[in-house]
Swiss-Prot record:
Pfam families: KIAA1549 (PF12877). The keyword Protease does not apply. Signal peptide: none annotated. InterPro entries: KIAA1549. Belongs to the UPF0606 family. The lineage of its organism: Eukaryota, Metazoa, Chordata, Craniata, Vertebrata. The chain crosses the membrane at residues 1180-1200. This is UPF0606 protein KIAA1549L.
Length: 1849
């Protein structure tokens, strides 16, 4: 391909195709340094490359064709050479100006030869050597100057040689020079070539001359010395050469070339060398005029070079053509064949006819044909590699055709007038040449870019070689060898040429040698050389430079050495030179080439390199054949052939140098200057040897070393270059001049550039100087050699070449040393072969042959001539396993790239290529696979990068390894940030690809010995931002990381029920479709996130459920009609591995806000979620059908339960139960007990309300209250449960069972109060910074315990005992312990009575309950009331003691403890007492019965007295009085004895008295019994505590300071007080209460409930109650501030309490509550003021909050009764005056009531004091009246219960 391009480029440039031979060769060399890859093998390839790169006058390639087309065979030949050289040069220029010049050097050599021909006829006469010299110089200068000229030349290909050649130059020579100029100093080499004695010598010198110096090279002048070359021995040749050199001065040289008539093909060639040594056609020289004609045709300058001599130069142009393209090498070969003819021309002076005959193709044509055919096989390879134009076979054919044409075959091939031209060529080959070459040129040029040349070649039967053929036959051969070898190799080194060349060489060599006679041999040698050249080209392709430096380099070296060796062996001089060449390296290669030329056959062999050399040798050996076939003397043809072969063998420049050298000593290896040439050759040989040695090393330098021309090697090694230069110079003047070290380095530089090897790159720099044309030529040769080298590996004729190439290719170690990346088995490609041989010896030869075959296949597959296969491992079992890697210079291709390219190339093609080199190959079992198996697809992931620079070759291992390191850093960072771990993650890039400016990296991530799944690795790297990933990779990522394969779940129709559809808007068309796995995966991830989000939202409903894992599988993505590009996503979801029904999944997604969904999906959501199958399975309906009835049944049951429980609920509303829930459960238990005691206390309170019982109520109040308190704390729960069981409606409390209701209410109140007090206590504690909670808790507990004790006290007889039982009092205070012991003793006795009475009372109460239930009420408090009655009895009995206890704080303190101790008994008794109270047993005093009845009535009355004022005061009193209740109850004990009860004949009075008595009994129980024991303890505690706390504790606040002990007792008294005072109020103070406090209605509800009810009332009352509570705390604090002890129990507390009460009384609610508190039995009226303060306390507030209490109180106790009972019970101890005073305070609200109650309280207290010691007095207290009153009350209550209930509700 490259060759074709080269040719085309040359044509474009206007370089004559004929010139390609010599020029091309040089050109290639130059190119190769310049272009690097292109410089391989062929000038054309190089040229193409540059052309592509530069918009240089690349077009010249066609011009080249044109030049070739020049009419004159001579001009044509010159043109060919020039084209060859110039093309190369131009190519280089096109590609890189610097490179161009470098590359030109080699082409210059060829051009030089052309130039020689180009040179004036004298140059021709000079034999080829003179012409060559001239050409070389001309070429060199021309090259430098005429870079563009070649284009011009091409422009005028058909025109007269002058115009055509010189687009810049007048003659065809000008085009050649142009090319050369581009090539720069190629001509120099030609100068060095002396005409060998043999005919061929002259041609060779011409060829050498053909090497044209670059424009800047003055050295071309020296080159002219080439005259020694004249094969004919004609001395005119040198002059011609000189002329050429002159023309080499650049543009003018062409003219000189023109001077060369076709008769001296050499001269003509020299003439060609003129400008750029464009007329390197010198090879056309005399040898084969027919050849020349062909060359002319190729050149297309035929017209320009009408003259035969000029025609030859024109031929050179065609040669150039071949050089430019891959085929050009073949063309060069053809040219060489032509050259062979040319040599006849050159010999023309000497043996023009003989050579002409050869060229004539008389023999040649036949031979040529054969050879062409044979060559074609070779050529085919070459062609494929080189030119698209010429088939490889064509190229080969062309080459051989060229020879043939020169022989006659080429002519024949040249449709135009191949034979005729050839025939005419002898006489006036230029004309014929023009025609013939034109034809050839046309074909060549198109394929190579030198279409004309290619075509010409094809026409000639070697279409690729057409251009080459055009090169003079004799010279053409040389040129062909040089040009093809150098130019093509250089360009082919690009890839194409090399492979073909290899094939070509073997075929060519064999066929050519055999087929061609002397002329043919010469040509054949060129052919062989061409083969070699092609190999060289291949190497150059590797690098045209590659050839030099790349493995081809080593191969080339080896080949060259072998060639040289062969040449040396075959030809004595050549052999020696050849030998020297290996030694000298750079010089030697030239020498070898020259030597080969000189040796003719030997030279050819050597030139070919192993194969070529062999072939050449054979050809040389067959000089007879040649001679026989060729008309011209065999010697001449042989010489020509040798020269050609030598040239071909070497890179074109090298060949040129060799030709020059040969020209000097062509026959002897020193023609004109035999000694000089010999020495030069020797030097070259030495250099070559050295270089050869290096070359095998596979370094560019080595390659260069391998070549005689140091220039190529100079890239790597300047020394070599120098030696080469020296050698060349030594060999011949011209040669020496040409071989200037500077120039050579420059050429090599170009080649090196082409070569991937760094050495080559270095070499180009080394060869930067291009002073000597010879150097340029040498460089060209070197490039060619390099190219050849690779081809040799591939070449058939590899007897020598193959091993050398093999060594180079196989020696991976040597190659690896210069490779740009670290080699490992990961870069190896594995190919498995089946061989026919059972036993295969794995030898170096087998390795070499396989390497050659693989190289050939790779070059064809990559379409590059500089690609080489390096076999690293060769294993054999039943088959052969080959492990190799592909390189291009220093670049190593990734296995994936090689596998892909070979896969495209095809197994059959690879097999065919391998069979050419390994005949035993049976088949290819495994075409190509990675040596290490690749990880599975699901391990692989890809990253897509943008803006990867063109400089980065993504196919190279260097790029891959760099990206691996960067990716590793990125992954390590991601792992550290995301996983907080650090492990040695490794990256292995599997493949790279480039599409639409985005580079895709496919790689795997390994963790030690295992690989990460692609999904895992991609998700890890995706955690990093795109910016960060771009930072690590240095390129912005288009896709950060994406798995190559996605694990897909089942997406068949079986999952249809689970499908869900979501419609998005704004989805790009490129994203829709399942093929776009990336988008599908992204949407799956985002949808899974949405499911997780919905689950998180649902967690608040299902806290226990843990988030499961959702997996989303995309089923399909499709476009749907609608605006904004809607796309429909169908997917289904797995939750914890189980699929979700579509309906369920859609429902889940529908819970997510559409906006959030859009933000998550990054697209507008048109449809959130819609199930595909919308009807859920039938089983759902079944489930629903089953669940529905169950649900209905459940609802019905719930409703029934609610209805059945409604009564209880209603009863509890006013009761403590409502508040109890507010209280802690433990408090409930206490509440429960309190309720029992409280209810009883309430009954007792009711009794005291009846003035008769007023005395009892005080002690009873205290005791019961304390009990209640204890119950509050300890028995609230029990109370609750009991209440729940016995829950009565509020009206029940007021009903006949009012005793019970009163008791429960008081009990309830007590719990409520406890709760309220706790609240207050908390508030107070907050204010005091006291841990209220603890105190409250303690208070509640103690309160409960006191309540428990109080409940037993509730029984009037056992009240004292119950109180004593209260454990709290006893443990608390030691003094109380004594009292508690007394009380306990009393209690024990009382308990027995109480138990008795309880049974009766419970029986009675049960009856009452039944009645109440019938009426819709449940007398929950009844039980408590019974207990309360029992306790009351006890309290009455112990009243005096309890009073004392009350007075004594210690006793109080003990009392609570006692209560707590007795709590268990009390609890048990509570239940029983409740029952007994419910049905008072006869054992109980009438008082108890009265109390029992009274309570219900009280409850009724409470409802009746539910006036707002009463409630308010009640509440106030409850709060304040409760605490006071303690103190007062204690005080009251004394005062209460002075009964303040005013006996009232009316039932109301009786009931009031009952309540009073009950209250007093409770107060006595708490104050006396509990008070002395418990109460006194409580009192003591109260003393310790501020009075207010004590007071508060009664409601619930006092407990805090007292640690709850006092609080409990206090609380009870309060509850009892509440219950009792309320009845008192009810009887006497109701009206005033109403007046005093507007809010009573609410309190009345709570009234019956004691504390709990008060609390309820607080909540019920609402703001008022809360206000009261809020104010309550302050008073409570005030009270707290003054400890109870501090306050004189009576006065102080009274005063404060009164004040507080008054204050509260100011508030309606507080006033009301205060009044009830005052009424409590435990605290007689004195407490009225205190109760308000307590109400101010939180406790009071809580009481106030009790709405139920007021109602119950209203039902059971009239406010007046309360007030009366309160003063009596409350202030029993305080003086009556105190009571009044206190009353006066509340009296603000209702003074009369206060006053009235005071006396009654006093009386009751007194009576209580009297009665307390014994139960009898209490029992005797108007028992009959009380019973009667109770009964009446019960009746009234029964009547009022309904109303009451309603009110309470």
């Amino acid at each position: 391909m490259d060759h074709t391009a080269s040719q085309n480029a040359q044509d474009l440039i206007g370089i004559p195709h004929l010139g390609v031979s010599g020029s091309s060769t040089k050109w290639h060399s130059e190119l190769s340094p310049t272009e690097g890859p292109h410089s391989a093998g062929s000038s054309t390839p190089g040229f193409l490359s540059p052309m592509a790169e530069l918009s240089h006058p690349s077009p010249p390639p066609p011009a080249l064709g044109s030049l070739l087309q020049l009419p004159d065979g001579s001009p044509s030949w010159s043109m060919l050479e020039v084209a060859s050289g110039p093309a190369s040069t131009q190519q280089i220029k096109a590609g890189v100006p610097g490179r161009v010049h470098n590359g030109v050097s080699l082409p210059t050599f060829k051009n030089t030869e052309t130039a020689t021909h180009e040179a004036e006829p004298p140059l021709f006469q000079t034999a080829e050597s003179g012409a060559i010299e001239m050409t070389s110089r001309k070429l060199a200068s021309a090259t430098a100057n005429d870079s563009a000229n070649p284009l011009h030349l091409s422009a005028a290909p058909e025109n007269s040689r002058g115009p055509a050649l010189s687009a810049e130059h007048t003659s065809s020579l000008v085009p050649s020079l142009h090319i050369t100029t581009l090539g720069q100093e190629q001509a120099i080499l030609s100068g060095a070539v002396p005409a060998s004695p043999s005919t061929g010598t002259a041609d060779f010198p011409s060829i050498l001359t053909f090497l044209q110096p670059t424009e800047n090279h003055a050295s071309p002048s020296p080159v002219p010395e080439m005259p020694t070359l004249p094969a004919e021995g004609s001395d005119g040749s040198p002059p011609a050469t000189r002329d050429l050199l002159l023309s080499s001065k650049v543009p003018n040289l062409l003219s000189t070339s023109w001077t060369f008539p076709r008769w001296k093909k050499d001269s003509v060639t020299a003439i060609l060398g003129k400008n750029e040594e464009a007329n390197v056609t010198i090879p056309l020289q005399a040898f084969p005029r027919k050849e020349v004609l062909s060359l002319h045709t190729v050149n297309g300058f035929v017209s320009d070079f009408s003259t035969g001599s000029v025609s030859s130069p024109i031929i050179t142009a065609p040669r150039t053509n071949p050089l430019p393209s891959g085929p050009p090498l073949p063309s060069i070969l053809s040219i060489q064949a032509t050259q062979t003819v040319f040599p006849s021309l050159g010999f023309s002076s000497t043996k023009p006819e003989a050579y002409a005959a050869a060229v004539d193709h008389s023999g040649l044509p036949a031979s040529a044909s054969k050879q062409v055919r044979a060559s074609p096989s070779s050529m085919d390879v070459y062609d494929s590699l080189t030119i698209g134009d010429m088939k490889k076979p064509a190229t080969t054919d062309v080459f051989w055709s060229s020879l043939s044409a020169e022989t006659g075959s080429l002519s024949t091939e040249s449709i135009i007038s191949g034979l005729q031209q050839q025939t005419n060529y002898d006489l006036n080959g230029h004309t014929i040449s023009t025609t013939s070459w034109e034809t050839h040129l046309a074909p060549t040029a198109p394929p190579n870019g030198l279409t004309s040349a290619a075509d010409a070649i094809k026409s000639q039967d070697f279409k690729d070689t057409a251009g080459h053929s055009v090169t003079a036959e004799g010279f053409s051969i040389q040129d062909l060898v040089l040009g093809t070898s150098i130019e093509q190799p250089v360009q082919q080194s690009d890839m194409t040429m090399v492979g073909s060349h290899i094939d070509l060489w073997p075929t060519s060599n064999n066929n050519h040698s055999r087929d061609f006679q002397t002329a043919e041999v010469a040509y054949y040698s060129p052919t062989t050389r061409h083969s070699v050249s092609h190999p060289q080209l291949q190497l150059p392709n590797q690098p045209a430079h590659p050839l030099l430096l790349t493995s081809p380099g080593p191969t080339s070296t080896g080949s060259l050495q072998e060639m040289l060796s062969d040449g040396t062996d075959t030809g004595s001089e050549i052999s020696s030179d050849i030998n020297s060449s290996p030694e000298r390296n750079a010089s030697t290669p030239f020498q070898n080439i020259l030597g080969y030329h000189s040796a003719a056959e030997s030279s050819i062999s050597t030139s070919v390199f192993p194969r070529t050399s062999s072939r050449v040798l054979r050809a040389s050996q067959h000089p007879k054949k040649w001679t026989a076939d060729t008309v011209s003397s065999k010697v001449q043809p042989t010489a020509a052939a040798a020269v050609t072969l030598f040239l071909r063998k070497s890179s074109p420049p090298a060949l040129s140098a060799a030709l020059v050298a040969k020209g000097t000593s062509s026959s002897p290896l020193a023609v004109a200057s035999g000694p000089a040439k010999s020495s030069s050759m020797t030097t070259l040989a030495k250099n070559v040897t050295n270089k050869a040695a290096s070359g095998p090393k596979r370094t560019p330098g080595a390659v260069h070393t391998a070549f005689p021309f140091t220039p190529t090697y100079m890239y790597a090694r300047t020394g070599h270059t120098t030696s080469t230069h020296t050698a060349m110079q030594g060999n011949m003047d011209t040669a020496s001049g040409l071989l200037s070290t500077t120039y050579l380095p420059r050429k090599p530089q170009a080649m090196h550039t082409g070569l991937p090897n760094p050495t080559n790159l270095e070499m180009p720099r080394a060869s930067t100087p291009r002073p000597l044309t010879v150097t340029a030529a040498l460089t060209s040769i070197t490039a060619s050699v390099k190219a050849t080298r690779l081809p040799p590996l591939r070449a058939e004729n590899t007897d020598a070449v193959l091993p050398a190439a093999s060594a180079a290719v196989v020696t991976t170690g040597k190659m690896a040393s210069n490779l740009e990346c670290q080699m490992s088995s990961k870069l190896l490609v594995k190919t498995v072969l089946f061989l026919t041989q059972r036993r295969v010896q794995i030898s170096e030869s087998l390795k070499f042959s396989i390497a050659k075959g693989l190289t050939q296949a790779l070059r064809k597959a990559f379409h590059q001539n500089d690609v080489s296969a390096h076999v690293d491992i060769l294993e054999y079992s039943h088959n052969v396993t080959v492990g190799y890697y592909a390189t291009k210079g220093k670049l190593v291709y990734l296995p994936a790239v090689v596998i892909e390219m070979l896969g495209v190339y095809g197994v059959s093609n690879v097999t065919a290529d391998l069979k050419q080199h390994t005949p035993h190959l049976q088949s290819v079992a495994v075409l190509a696979s990675p040596w290490n198996p690749q990880p599975a697809g699901y391990f692989q992931l890809k990253t897509v990068l943008q803006f990867v620079s063109q400089a980065d070759n993504i196919q190279s291992c260097k790029f891959a390894q760099t990206m691996e390191q960067r990716l590793q850093k990125a992954f390590q960072d991601a792992e550290r940030k995301v996983l907080n771990t650090k492990s040695n993650l490794t990256i292995q890039i599997v493949s790279t690809s480039n599409a639409s400016q985005a580079v895709t990296l496919v790689y795997v991530v390994g963790n030690q010995s295992t690989f990460l799944n692609g999904t895992v690795a991609s998700s890890l790297l995706s955690q990093l931002s795109a910016e960060l990933v771009g930072f690590y990779l240095t390129y912005p990522p288009l896709t950060i990381a994406e798995p190559l394969e996605y694990p897909n779940l089942d997406i068949s129709e079986t999952t249809r029920d689970y499908w869900v559809i979501t419609v998005l808007q704004g989805v790009d068309n490129s994203l829709v479709g399942l093929h776009n796995q990336s988008f599908a995966r992204v949407m799956e991830q985002r949808l899974a996130q949405l499911f997780m989000m919905s689950q998180q939202q649902g967690r608040r409903f299902k806290r226990a459920t843990t988030l499961g894992s959702y997996t989303v599988q995309m089923v399909k993505m499709q476009r749907v009609p609608g605006p904004k590009d809607p796309a429909e996503l169908t997917y289904y979801t797995l939750y914890n591995g189980k699929p979700l029904l579509g309906t369920a999944a859609a429902k889940i997604l529908s819970t997510i806000d559409s906006q959030r969904m859009a933000l998550t999906l990054h697209h507008v959501v048109l449809l959130q979620a819609d199930p595909v199958v919308k009807n859920p399975p039938n089983n759902l309906w079944i489930i629903a059908a089953v669940l529905a009835p169950i649900a209905v049944v459940t609802v019905i049951i719930i409703i029934i339960t609610a209805v059945l429980c409604r009564k209880n609920k209603n009863d509890f509303k006013p009761d403590t139960m409502i508040n109890l829930p507010q209280r802690a459960k433990p408090v409930q238990g206490f509440d429960y007990a309190k309720q029992h005691l409280g209810q009883q206390g309430a009954d007792e309170e009711v009794i005291p309300v009846t003035q008769e019982t007023v005395v009892l109520p005080l002690p009873i109040r205290d005791a019961p209250q304390e009990r209640d308190v204890a119950q509050d704390g300890s028995t609230i729960k029990t109370a609750k449960s009991t209440e729940t069981r016995k829950s009565r409606s509020p009206s029940e409390n007021g009903s006949v069972i009012s005793n019970e209701s009163g008791k429960p209410s008081s009990g309830r109140r007590s719990p409520q109060n406890v709760m309220a007090q706790q609240k207050v206590t908390k508030e107070e504690a907050r204010k005091r910074n006291v841990p209220a909670s603890d105190e409250e808790e303690g208070a509640v507990l103690f309160d409960n315990s006191s309540k428990v004790a109080a409940e037993p006290f509730d029984t009037s007889s056992g009240s004292v005992q119950l109180i004593a039982i209260k454990p709290t009092a006893l443990p608390m205070v030691p003094p109380t312990s004594d009292r508690s012991q007394e009380s306990s003793a009393v209690l024990n006795g009382e308990v027995n009575k109480a138990l008795k009475q309880k049974s009766d009372i419970e029986h009675y109460r049960n009856k009452l309950r039944l009645k109440a239930k019938r009426k819709g009420y449940y007398d929950f408090p009844a039980v408590e009331t019974s207990k309360g009655l029992t306790e009351r009895k006890k309290m009455y009995e112990k009243a005096p003691k309890e009073m004392e206890h009350v007075l004594d704080p210690d006793s109080e303190l003990c009392a609570p403890f006692t209560e707590s101790k007795n709590r268990q008994q009390m609890k048990n008794s509570v239940y029983r007492s409740r029952q007994s109270l419910n049905s008072p047993s006869p054992g109980e005093t009438e008082m108890d019965l009265l109390v029992t009845r009274e309570r219900p009535r009280r409850g009724i009355r409470n409802s009746g007295y539910d006036t707002e004022p009463e409630i308010i005061e009640e509440t106030n009193i409850d709060r304040v009085p409760e605490p006071r209740g303690y103190s007062r109850s204690r005080q009251v004990k004394g005062h209460s004895e002075t009964s303040t009860l005013s006996s009232q004949p009316s039932i109301d009075e009786v009931r009031q008295q009952m309540h009073m008595l009950l209250e007093e009994a409770f107060s006595l129980a708490s104050a006396g019994h509990a008070g002395q024991s418990r109460h006194q303890e409580a009192y003591g505690s109260a003393q310790h505590l501020p009075y207010s706390e004590v007071v508060t504790s009664a409601p619930g606040t006092m407990t805090r300071p007292r640690a709850g002990v006092q609080w409990v007792p206090t609380y009870r008294p309060e509850m009892y007080q509440y219950s009792l005072p309320r009845p008192a109020y009810r009887f006497s103070q109701l009206p005033e209460m109403v007046m005093g406090s507007p809010p009573p209605p609410v309190p009345p509800r709570t009234g019956p409930v004691a504390v709990a009810s008060l609390r309820r009332s607080t909540s019920d009352i609402g703001s008022k109650t809360r206000m009261a509570e809020s104010t309550g705390p302050e008073p409570a604090q005030l009270h707290d501030s003054a400890s109870f002890t501090q306050m004189s129990r009576g006065p102080v507390s009274v005063t404060q309490l009164d004040q507080s009460a008054l204050n509260y009384s100011g508030n309606t609610v507080p006033a009301v509550f205060a009044i009830p508190a005052a009424n409590r039995p435990g605290f007689t009226g004195y407490f009225i003021p205190t109760p308000p303060s307590s109400y101010r306390n939180q406790a009071w507030m809580s009481y106030a909050g009790e709405n139920e209490l007021p109602s119950q109180w209203a039902d059971s106790v009239p406010l007046p009764g309360y007030i009366e009972a309160y003063p009596r019970s409350r202030y029993p101890q305080s003086s009556p005056s105190r009571l009044p005073r206190q009353y006066s305070q509340p009296a603000n609200l209702h003074p009369s009531l206060e006053q009235a109650p005071a006396p009654s309280t006093a009386a009751s207290q007194q009576s209580l004091a009297e009665n307390d010691p014994s139960d009898a007095p209490l029992t005797n207290i108007s028992t009959a009246a009380l019973v009667k009153a109770i009964r009446e009350e019960v009746a009234k209550l029964a009547k009022k219960q309904t109303d009451m209930f309603e009110f309470q509700v």
